[in-house]
Design a protein with these regions (language model features):
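Short beta-strand/loop motif that positions the catalytic acidic residue
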Residues: 209, 215-217
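Conserved HGGG/HGGXW glycine-rich cap/lid loop of the alpha/beta-hydrolase fold
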Residues: 10-62
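Flexible "cap/lid" loop of the alpha/beta hydrolase fold
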Residues: 103-107, 114-154
Length: 268
């Protein structure tokens, strides 16, 4: 069910199914992203006895655009959203750029979360020795001019292992969420200045997270994710890391059944 609620002065749209312990899903930040990325996941979680919630982050989907476009604002917004829906604690699922946001908010507010599931987050993996990033950074996948259906196809091609799952319906949905205020927000995010914190890389702080933690990736995800997962496991053997074969960055969509099964097993 689609609902709206006021959070930090912004009309915030969210999808909610089921009743029980809350599980909150955070979508990524590429052009066209929204809570609808979890349409293949919410029913399974609701059916397993959870209150499954995915919300459009500020500047995405049907949620108002914010004044502050930095990812750090959207990170703090997570706790404000939990307060608004009367969830004192929740399991948190963060996809892509939101995996890093989820890790940071769990470090900052450990008592607010029961479990942490980081999905396809390049920002929580170590770099391979001698390698530099290639392609657009997380949250920068998009266009500099008003996007077209073909632009959406190019973005989705980079996110799917099985290209046959990229339907016209999916492309049209993503395009709809890319236009108007959402395209304005995408451009504003690309220009936003993030706080320069320096310090310890996020992947070195994962061991500080005090709640059960699972890192989950499509085995064919971009950015050498599988190799970087292996490197992280070597560096931090206690971390739980799983790969789903025949899936890329949008593992939540193209391998939804396997993702749901793995995530629910972790939560229970």
């Amino acid at each position: 069910m689609e609902r709206t609620i006021q959070v930090d002065g912004l009309k915030t749209c969210y999808l909610e199914e089921g009743a029980g312990a809350p599980v909150v899903f955070l979508h990524g930040a590429s052009l066209g992203s929204s809570a609808r990325a979890f349409e293949r996941n919410l029913p399974a979680f609701a059916g397993a006895g959870f209150r499954a919630i995915a919300y459009d982050q500020p500047g995405f989907g049907l949620t108002d655009n914010p004044i502050d476009y930095a990812a750090s604002y959207r990170t703090q917004f997570i706790v404000k959203f939990l307060d608004a829906i009367d969830a004192s604690r929740a399991a948190l699922v963060g996809h892509s750029q939101a995996a890093g946001m989820a890790a940071r908010v769990a470090l900052q507010h450990p008592t607010r979360f029961t479990h942490l599931l980081l999905v396809g987050g390049g920002g929580v993996l170590p770099p391979l020795p001698g390698k530099t990033g290639g392609g657009p950074a997380e949250g920068q996948e998009g266009t500099s001019t008003t996007p077209t259906l073909e632009d959406m196809r190019k973005i989705m091609d980079n996110n799917f292992f099985n290209k046959g799952l990229i339907t016209t319906e999916l492309l049209e949905q993503r395009l709809k969420m890319s236009l108007g205020k959402n395209f304005d927000a995408f451009i504003a995010r690309s220009r936003a200045r993030e706080p320069q914190g320096g310090g310890v890389p996020l992947y070195q702080r994962l061991k500080e997270i005090s709640v059960p933690l699972l890192l989950l990736y499509g085995k064919q995800d971009r950015g050498s994710a599988a190799q970087r997962c292996a490197l992280l496991k070597e560096q931090e053997p206690s971390l739980r890391i799983e790969l789903i074969d025949n899936a890329a960055h949008l593992v939540i969509w193209e391998a939804a059944d396997k993702f749901n099964e793995t995530a629910l097993r972790f939560l229970k």
